[in-house]
A protein has these predicted regions:
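Short, compact, well-ordered microdomains
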Residues: 50-87
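A motif-centric signal for short, conserved binding hotspots located
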Residues: 1-59, 63-65
């Protein structure tokens, strides 16, 4: 998905982990991802050059950022989704 920062209007490439789209996320990040489950909770482990990131279900994986992840409530306030590229 293509998102833009509400403040700077910079393009952000991100995908939301919904608990079932492991192949989409793996293709998006270009590395192997691991699905972790415990009881009814599902997480995604993504390996990056900064180390492993644990993404909760509903969380976002963001390309080209040091943290590489974003919480749901932060994403809604900081970014907006667009269907077209705007530079």
């Amino acid at each position: 998905m293509i998102y833009h920062d509400r403040n700077t209007k910079k393009r952000i490439d991100a995908i939301q982990w919904n608990g079932m789209n492991i192949y989409e996320v793996s293709s998006f990040v270009g590395t192997n991802v691991t699905c972790l489950e415990r009881f009814n909770d599902t997480w995604l482990k993504v390996s990056t050059i900064f180390g492993s990131l644990i993404i909760p279900e509903g969380g976002y994986v963001i390309k080209h950022m040091e943290s590489g992840k974003c919480k749901i409530d932060v994403a809604g306030k900081k970014y907006f989704e667009t269907t077209y590229e705007k530079d």
